[in-house]
């Protein structure tokens, strides 16, 4: 059996049955899927006319483009007319893109023709010529001029005259390279994605993929990424610099405090602390710290003194005392060497007859030792002749409480 027997049917004629579903182009299914997804045609595979009429976003783009190309106010193109013609004449998206190629050629080659034709007639005749170019005679998709006239509401003689004028303006140059079709398809996809995203207020992943394929969007995104990277680098440098400056400041302050308040080698000077605490009671003790600020700075510099101060201040809360006697009128202290010599023997000086208010009266109960005067060690600067301190006056207790609240506020 030869090839002729395979192609001819029983009646001896060549039948095209079964060839309509045959895919000649390898990328036909891929192109159809791309058009359905990016031009908002949907995925209704069971519908026969899913790709035989323009989608709503594509119709909007066609109306906007043709109104700008043919600005004549006569028979101005409307979306309702586009939808009706595309549904009645079964306009495919490929015919729509080819018609856009023809209109772009007219804008460059014969712009005077576009000034005299209406936008509705331009849409109808461009779609008809594009469909005739794509679907040759004998195809099922073939639509005659009378059907086009009925779909567009134009008489057949008028439609024939419009077709001859369009072909003359095109100089019968209808051939189109496939690359031009794909360029128009890419432009149409970007217009549809941008328009629909602005209308909704947000973009789908498909819209973003379409927009990022455009050179202008790639340049804009690249410049935005560069600015974000520069801003991130500046913020990182500023953060690292601030952290380094803070660490350096803390180190310098710690070192300066450590150098200014580092105690000398040797046993701790417990007598100095005792003398500072009991200064209101024992005015004859020399070399007391001048202010609580110096005491607090030394506490931060020495760990041993901090622990000592903690133990001392923990024991500074005495038991409740009986109500004190009415205070006597203050008597100025006299710088009498006999008072300083005899303050441990008698509260009254026999030479100047002035009372010594800070001298201890007698040894009392053991809880008076909580005021922290250490025993006279051999290396202590406190003289061994000074006995353990006794209960101080109300003025000294107030001073100690004020010192405690200053060192540990709250």
From Swiss-Prot:
TM ranges: 233-253
Q: Which domain of life is it from?
A: Eukaryota
Q: Which GO terms describe its molecular function?
A: cyclin-dependent protein serine/threonine kinase regulator activity; protein kinase binding
Q: List the subcellular locations.
A: Membrane
Q: Which GO terms describe its cellular component?
A: cyclin-dependent protein kinase holoenzyme complex; membrane; nucleus
Keywords attached to this entry: Membrane, Transmembrane, Transmembrane helix
How does the protein associate with the membrane? Single-pass membrane protein
* Matching Pfam families: Cyclin (PF08613)
Q: Does the keyword Membrane apply?
A: yes
Q: Report the family membership.
A: Belongs to the CNPPD1 family.
Which PANTHER family would you find in this protein's record? PROTEIN CNPPD1 (PTHR15615:SF108), PTHR15615
**Protein name per its UniProtKB record:** Protein CNPPD1
Question: Taxonomy-wise, where does this protein's organism fall, top ranks first?
Answer: Eukaryota, Metazoa, Chordata, Craniata, Vertebrata
């Amino acid at each position: 059996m030869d090839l002729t027997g395979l192609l001819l049917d029983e009646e001896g004629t060549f039948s095209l049955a079964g060839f309509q579903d045959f895919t000649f182009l390898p990328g036909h299914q891929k192109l159809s899927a791309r058009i359905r997804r990016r031009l908002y045609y949907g995925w209704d595979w069971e519908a026969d006319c899913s790709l035989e009429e323009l989608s709503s976003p594509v119709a909007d783009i066609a109306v906007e483009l043709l109104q700008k190309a043919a600005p004549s106010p006569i028979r101005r193109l409307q979306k309702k007319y586009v939808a009706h013609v595309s549904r009645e004449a079964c306009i495919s998206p490929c015919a729509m893109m080819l018609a856009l190629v023809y209109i772009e050629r007219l804008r460059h080659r014969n712009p005077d023709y576009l000034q005299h034709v209406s936008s509705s007639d331009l849409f109808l005749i461009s779609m008809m010529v594009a469909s005739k170019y794509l679907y040759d005679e004998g195809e099922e998709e073939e639509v005659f001029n009378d059907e086009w006239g009925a779909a567009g509401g134009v008489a057949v003689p008028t439609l024939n005259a419009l077709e001859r004028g369009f072909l003359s303006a095109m100089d019968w140059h209808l051939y189109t390279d496939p690359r031009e079709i794909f360029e128009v398809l890419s432009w149409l996809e970007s217009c549809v994605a941008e328009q629909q995203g602005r209308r909704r207020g947000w973009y789908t992943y498909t819209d973003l993929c379409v927009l990022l394929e455009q050179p202008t969007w790639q340049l804009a995104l690249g410049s935005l990424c560069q600015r974000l990277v520069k801003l991130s680098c500046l913020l990182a440098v500023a953060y690292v610099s601030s952290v380094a400056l803070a660490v350096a400041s803390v180190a310098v302050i710690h070192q300066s405090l450590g150098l200014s308040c580092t105690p000398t080698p040797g046993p701790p000077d417990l007598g100095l602390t005792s003398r500072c605490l009991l200064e209101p009671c024992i005015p004859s003790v020399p070399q007391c710290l001048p202010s609580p600020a110096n005491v607090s700075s030394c506490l931060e510099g020495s760990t041993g003194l901090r622990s000592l101060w903690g133990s001392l201040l923990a024991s500074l809360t005495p038991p409740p005392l009986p109500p004190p006697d009415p205070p006597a009128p203050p008597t100025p202290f006299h710088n009498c060497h006999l008072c300083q010599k005899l303050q441990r023997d008698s509260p009254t000086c026999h030479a100047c007859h002035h009372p010594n208010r800070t001298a201890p009266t007698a040894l009392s109960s053991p809880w008076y030792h909580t005021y922290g005067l250490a025993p006279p060690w051999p290396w202590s600067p406190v003289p061994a002749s000074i006995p353990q301190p006794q209960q101080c006056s109300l003025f000294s207790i107030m001073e100690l409480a004020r010192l405690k609240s200053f060192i540990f506020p709250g």
